[in-house]
Amino acid sequence: KRIKNIDTQGIFVPGFSGISAPYWKPGFDDVYVELGSDPNQIIRAGMESIGFLFNDILNCFKSNGMKIPKTLTAAGGAGRPVLLQFISSLIDLEICYFDRKDRTAIGVYRILSGNHFKDESENRNRKSFKPKLLTYKNRKIAKWTETLINLNIKDNYSEM
């Protein structure tokens, strides 16, 4: 709720415990690009960094020939509407959120296997996040990528 209506031009790269997939870089200092001292903008940029990493992981899948389903599922800790809407808009895919505690394994199974079996119980208590136009999307992805390249986290010639 706190950052629902907050916009930021800045980028935050969380480094305290390192950066995870697809880069696997061990700990480094957090990086703030074009972020001032407004805590809400820093929180928003931190949330967006999760979306950018998710986008980079999907791009790895695509560059390795994996087909991404039209709808992704999320649950558990990912159940933050602002985050799920941002990711949906960033990757141009619908994301369905189920209120069951942990559906991570089923989501991974569906992505990797392409098996989209239907379980009618899944349709209960489901929220759907459809992509919305992000006017700044390409600019922010480019800034994220440039920041990772400047930090020697991402290869300049990588297809991700």
Question: What residue spans do the PLM features occupy?
Answer:
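Glycine/Thr-rich phosphate-binding loops that ligate phosphate moieties of nucleotide
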Residues: K1-M160
